[in-house]
């Protein structure tokens, strides 16, 4: 706050202060309303976009990936339109959800997804690839999705911990193993991605851990930036 106001020095006005106060207190839905009309060509990908795509990665695309049709190739808007009724059902959308205090990913992801696709900024983001692995023997609860922005940049989003025992067991394993199977899978997923593209890697919670781990371990320097939103046990990664 101080840095922002110092930039304006004696020229600062109550208008600047009020506008910055509004920006500082925005949530994701406010951001979509404020910047949703700007494509990525005009306003480049930023940390809030990373947060939104990290949350959207929690949506259970596997419900349709395994049952009806492949999700790859669709824009987010096309995907939601195609599966609109099921998105509501699987997401259990509550129109009155408190986005600031009720942050259970499975509940908020469908809500934010359906809101985001109504904006120019997110509607034309294309789903390039999706992978979901749940293996009790190997102790893996892993999901990742690759998006392509309207400017051609790709974003790999790693999903965090779900409500399964396997997912929580993974979190515990992160505290004493140098590498868990899910981290190895995260690196493998990125290394199998298409070359010749510019990438961002993002994730929330365990997904943030996998994003940073992948960034450190990847074979090629193809990543422009990595955003780990509340990535768990990041300190352990930095000691590897």
Role assignments for model-derived ranges:
Residues 2-202, 209, 213-240:
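Non-catalytic, mobile gating and regulatory segments of ester bond hydrolases
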């Amino acid at each position: 706050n101080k840095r922002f106001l110092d930039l304006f020095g004696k020229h600062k006005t109550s208008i600047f202060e009020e506008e910055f106060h509004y920006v500082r207190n925005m949530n994701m839905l406010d951001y979509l309303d404020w910047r949703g009309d700007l494509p990525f060509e005009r306003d480049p990908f930023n940390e809030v976009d990373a947060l939104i795509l990290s949350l959207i990665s929690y949506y259970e695309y596997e419900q349709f990936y395994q049952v009806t049709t492949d999700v790859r190739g669709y824009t987010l808007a096309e995907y939601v339109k195609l599966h609109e009724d099921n998105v509501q059902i699987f997401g259990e959308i509550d129109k009155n959800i408190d986005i600031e205090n009720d942050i259970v990913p499975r509940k908020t992801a469908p809500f934010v997804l359906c809101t985001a696709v109504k904006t120019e900024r997110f509607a034309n983001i294309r789903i390039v690839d999706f992978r979901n692995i749940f293996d009790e023997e190997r102790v893996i609860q892993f999901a990742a999705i690759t998006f392509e922005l309207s400017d051609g940049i790709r974003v790999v989003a790693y999903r965090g911990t779900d409500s399964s025992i396997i997912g929580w067991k993974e979190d515990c394993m992160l505290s004493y193993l140098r590498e868990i199977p899910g981290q190895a899978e995260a690196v493998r997923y990125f290394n199998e991605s298409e070359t010749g593209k510019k990438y961002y890697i993002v994730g929330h919670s365990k997904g943030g851990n996998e994003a940073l781990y992948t960034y450190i371990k990847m074979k090629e320097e193809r990543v422009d930036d990595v955003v780990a939103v509340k990535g768990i046990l990041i300190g352990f990664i930095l000691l590897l």
